[in-house]
Amino acid sequence: MGKMIYLMGKSSTGKDTIYKHLLQWKEIPFEKVVLYTTRPIRAHEKDGREYHFTDEVHYQELFKAGKIIEDRVYQTFYGPWRYFTVDDGSIDLQNQNYLVIGTLESFVKTTEYFSKDQVLPIYIEVDDGIRL
């Protein structure tokens, strides 16, 4: 049975660097969980690689269908942007291991959706003097 490793921590603690290194490990193969977002795509991004880019209408359809595992919304200058994980059939914890970067709140919701046995937390903490 696979596991989902959930990396968490404050900004600038090295989560992205650790994430990239772990994805390169061959001893423990990890798959990426590609999140969804309603924010606009940026010039260097590709749909399905960094995120699945969608809109509020599609989010509402997924929500009504019970497909949203966890979601967060941020109020921006441009309006609300959602980031969310969807049960779209791409997560197969029976046969694969996954690596995710998220918040404590998204970890809790993901654990409630799957189970404590399948979603394992790693909280990265770095002294503020080093981090900043």
Where are the regions a protein language model picked out?
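Hydrophobic anchor at the beta1->P-loop junction of P-loop NTPases
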Residues: L7
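The conserved Walker
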Residues: K10-S11
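Walker A/P-loop
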Residues: K15-D16
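The feature captures the helix immediately C-terminal to the Walker
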Residues: Y19-K20
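Post-Walker A helix-loop "phosphate-sensing" segment adjacent to the P-loop in P-loop NTPases
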Residues: Q24-K32
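ATP-dependent small-molecule kinase phosphotransfer cores
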Residues: T37-Y98, G102-L104
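Switch/connector loops and helix/strand junctions flanking conserved nucleotide-binding motifs
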Residues: R42-H44, V108-T110, D128-L132
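Conserved phosphate-donor/acceptor-positioning beta-strand/loop module used by diverse small-molecule
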Residues: N97-T103, F114-L132
